[in-house]
């Protein structure tokens, strides 16, 4: 059953144009929102097992910015990379080439959510030119350490089992309805039953839109093999960190510690939300983005 987005009406105010470009062997699909002649362009990178729909609630609240939102290679409608692993280095190299393929008149602001925060940080630390960087729910510390280390290891075993089993059984395991629902319940913090129902529907609709088992397992291995703290000291552009006080993936202490590693960063902690800021607090995130960029406006 399709549950209507609580942000659908706002999104109609910034209709999307779909495009396609070949990058490192991936036929990468992307969506553009806002005026093409805007002063500021923002390229947004979604999280693990997500695709471009995930960040649309934030985009729906923004006006006056050109926003380019691709599906990561191997997820959504984008085909996998060719000749590159789906690890942080591979995705960072793809992001550099994707930005170049957009033929922009000026460097784009780069935004990443969750797993996307690692990809973006790696790319910018490696030389991707951007005037500013925004990380939403940044992965601030190693996933195999801290309070969720055991769960991360168990999840890794789950993904590797999904790859090792016969294809039909493995695909069924990796896309299992109960597993997706458990993940969604674990991440959602909102007490609003309507919003929670929509969040769960989003995960069931989009969380299993990946190309093949190798891609999804490589992606998870990448998500736990690196974190933003590994790249922070090499990033000297102004950086906005949008964190959350109930994020089950990254503790408040880890978020505070991450801020100190950047030469020029500000940390804004949203209250009453966890790892799904883009679903549960999109207006607040959009307001922080507009203020940080000193451009655009809220819908």
For each feature predicted by the language model, list its residue ranges.
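Short beta-strand/loop motif that positions the catalytic acidic residue
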Residues: 235, 241-243
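Acidic catalytic loop of the alpha/beta-hydrolase fold
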Residues: 246-250
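Catalytic histidine-centered segment of alpha/beta-hydrolase-like enzymes
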Residues: 273-283
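Short glycine-enriched nucleophile-adjacent loop
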Residues: 117-128, 133
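Conserved HGGG/HGGXW glycine-rich cap/lid loop of the alpha/beta-hydrolase fold
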Residues: 26-77
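Active-site loop/oxyanion-hole signature of alpha/beta-hydrolase fold enzymes
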Residues: 23-26, 31, 69-115, 125-126, ...
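Conserved alpha/beta-hydrolase catalytic His-Asp/Glu region
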Residues: 168-233
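Flexible "cap/lid" loop of the alpha/beta hydrolase fold
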Residues: 132-168
């Amino acid at each position: 059953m399709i549950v209507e987005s609580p942000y659908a009406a706002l999104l109609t105010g910034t209709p999307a144009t779909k495009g396609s470009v070949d990058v490192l062997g991936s036929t990468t699909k992307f969506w553009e929102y806002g005026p093409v002649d805007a002063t500021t362009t923002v390229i947004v990178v979604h999280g693990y097992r997500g695709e471009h729909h995930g960040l649309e609630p934030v985009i729906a609240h923004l006006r006056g910015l050109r926003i380019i939102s691709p599906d990561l290679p191997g997820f959504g409608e984008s085909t996998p990379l060719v000749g590159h692993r789906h690890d942080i280095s591979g995705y960072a190299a793809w992001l550099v080439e994707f930005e170049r393929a957009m033929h922009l008149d000026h460097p784009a602001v780069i935004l990443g959510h969750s797993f996307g925060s690692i990809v973006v940080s790696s790319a910018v630390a490696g030389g991707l030119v951007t005037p500013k960087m925004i990380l939403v729910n940044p992965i601030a510390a190693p996933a195999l350490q801290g309070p969720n280390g055991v769960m991360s290891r168990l999840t890794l075993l789950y993904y590797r089992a999904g790859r090792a089993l016969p294809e039909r059984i493995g695909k069924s395991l990796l896309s299992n309805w109960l597993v997706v629902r458990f993940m969604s319940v674990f991440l959602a913090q909102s007490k609003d039953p309507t919003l929670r129902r929509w969040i769960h529907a989003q995960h069931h609709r989009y969380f299993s839109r990946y190309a093949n088992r190798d891609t999804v397992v490589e992606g998870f291995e990448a998500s736990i093999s690196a974190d933003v703290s590994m790249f922070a000291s090499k990033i000297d552009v102004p950086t906005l960190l949008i964190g959350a006080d109930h994020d089950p993936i990254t503790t408040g202490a880890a978020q505070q510690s991450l801020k100190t590693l950047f030469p020029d960063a500000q940390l804004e902690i949203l209250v009453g939300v966890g790892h799904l800021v883009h679903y549960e607090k999109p207006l607040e995130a959009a307001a922080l983005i507009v203020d940080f960029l000193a451009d655009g406006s809220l819908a």
